[in-house]
Amino acid sequence: MRIPLLAPDNYAFPDPAYALARCDGLVGVSRDLDAGRLLEAYRNGVFPWFSRDGWFFWYAVGPRAVIVPERLHVPRSLAKTLRNGSYRVAVNGCFAEVVAHCAAAARPNQDGTWIAPEFQTAYLKLHEMGHAHSFECHYPDENGKTRLAGGFYGVQIGRVFYGESMFALQPDASKIAFACAVPFLADLGVELIDCQQDTEHMRRFGSELLPFADFAERLRMLNAVPLKEEIGRREVACKGL
């Protein structure tokens, strides 16, 4: 199989439909992980999955797992935790720390992490540009001091939020962050959350599958529409629970 080589001076991607037709989803490889290439990738439903020997591998997945914010489902046990817990949720309070924890988190059936230092640097750049955001769940420790317990990060372009990775140092901490983040993002105008892959974890929150062509069309429409207001850095209240 011939793997498409992405030109260093051109951020355009081949049509992901060809990669999906081959069943492997590999859209191309590049030597760079520039912010401009990352943004162009997300706009086209493509994301970087891992690196090897200095090459970055870009993939598309279809059908695509997404969450429509108004159809978010919060499992009953998690809703109880949300009502009774002493947690605090914030956005963009400690982005670099969240990414570092996601990189260090153990994953089933994975040897190591795909979030290598080059990826962390790239997402930090997107964060500085206002496109990458973290949601953090904090819990008080035994001394009553609030500490980071879990969270996740992703990329926002227009009215789409592209989820990337989660971690939890305490049970349900990343789930709490996600359950609070979705209504918050919806209030700001986000209309679609990209989960990338179809997992049981996201199905519990009400994820659904879109044919890739439909997903790509939604991206074309929603990426061009700005949010009602910037995500910023603030506390996040859990609503409707």
From Swiss-Prot:
GO terms for cellular component: cytoplasm. It catalyses: N-terminal L-lysyl-[protein] + L-leucyl-tRNA(Leu) = N-terminal L-leucyl-L-lysyl-[protein] + tRNA(Leu) + H(+); N-terminal L-arginyl-[protein] + L-leucyl-tRNA(Leu) = N-terminal L-leucyl-L-arginyl-[protein] + tRNA(Leu) + H(+); L-phenylalanyl-tRNA(Phe) + an N-terminal L-alpha-aminoacyl-[protein] = an N-terminal L-phenylalanyl-L-alpha-aminoacyl-[protein] + tRNA(Phe). InterPro entries: Acyl_CoA_acyltransferase, Leu/Phe-tRNA_Trfase, Leu/Phe-tRNA_Trfase_C, Leu/Phe-tRNA_Trfase_N. Pfam families: Leu_Phe_trans. One of its GO terms (biological process) is protein catabolic process. It is found in: Cytoplasm. One of its GO terms (molecular function) is leucyl-tRNA--protein transferase activity. The keyword Cytoplasm applies. Keywords: Acyltransferase, Cytoplasm, Transferase. The keyword Acyltransferase applies. Its EC number is 2.3.2.6. Functions in the N-end rule pathway of protein degradation where it conjugates Leu, Phe and, less efficiently, Met from aminoacyl-tRNAs to the N-termini of proteins containing an N-terminal arginine or lysine. Belongs to the L/F-transferase family. This is Leucyl/phenylalanyl-tRNA--protein transferase. It comes from Neisseria gonorrhoeae (strain ATCC 700825 / FA 1090).
